[in-house]
């Protein structure tokens, strides 16, 4: 969803949307509700490059869904942070499973239900910001910025948005 458009300023092209992430498997699920296959109607084309980060010193980080490419990109900045990156991804899978799979379709309109979620949300470090959680796993400042950017996609600030939003990092991989 969102503002599917681009605009140009000088030699740069900016993406003006869409701003909401929708995983392809959710479209497949929607079509299956009507006993249809999405592939008969739409071709979903995977992108080789999802984002390119350009830092003020000219260094770039090409963010993609390809694990080998991601390993090379992370190691370009910090060999030791590759293990931290993998640990971060593994932790965000737990956040995804709770925050997206278990809770995204549940109404939080009952105090008892909300209170029952507190222990698991605490164990998932939901009290931390996205940037703070990423910093537990990644030491290189540029890599911290790369892996903290996901709240920006939904209008959030990585320094203040709850770390539950790191589930987007894992959602992208599904």
What is the predicted role of each segment?
Residues 1-94:
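N-terminal glycine-rich phosphate/pyrophosphate-binding loop and immediately adjacent elements
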Residues 10, 26, 156-174:
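Residues forming the flavin
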Residues 12-13, 114-117, 174:
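A short, structure-level motif marking secondary-structure boundaries and short turns
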Residues 32, 148, 166-169:
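Generic alpha-helical structural context detector
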Residues 38-39, 108, 167-170:
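Short, intrinsically disordered/low-complexity patches at protein termini
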Residues 56-162:
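Rossmann-like flavin
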């Amino acid at each position: 969803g969102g503002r599917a458009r681009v605009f140009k300023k000088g030699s740069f092209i900016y993406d003006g949307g869409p701003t909401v992430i929708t995983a392809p498997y959710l479209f497949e699920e929607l079509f299956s509700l009507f006993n249809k296959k999405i592939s008969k109607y739409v071709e979903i084309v995977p992108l080789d490059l999802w984002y390119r980060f350009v830092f003020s010193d000219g260094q770039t980080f090409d963010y993609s869904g390809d694990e080998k490419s991601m390993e090379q990109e992370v190691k370009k900045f910090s060999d030791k942070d590759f293990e931290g990156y993998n640990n971060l991804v593994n932790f965000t899978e737990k956040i995804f499973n709770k925050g997206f799979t278990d809770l995204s379709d549940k109404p939080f309109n009952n105090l008892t239900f909300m209170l029952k979620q507190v222990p698991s949300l605490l164990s998932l470090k939901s009290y931390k910001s996205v940037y703070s959680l990423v910093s537990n796993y990644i030491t290189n400042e540029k890599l911290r910025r790369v892996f903290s950017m996901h709240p920006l996609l939904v209008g959030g600030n990585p320094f203040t948005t709850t770390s539950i939003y790191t589930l987007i990092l894992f959602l992208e991989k599904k």
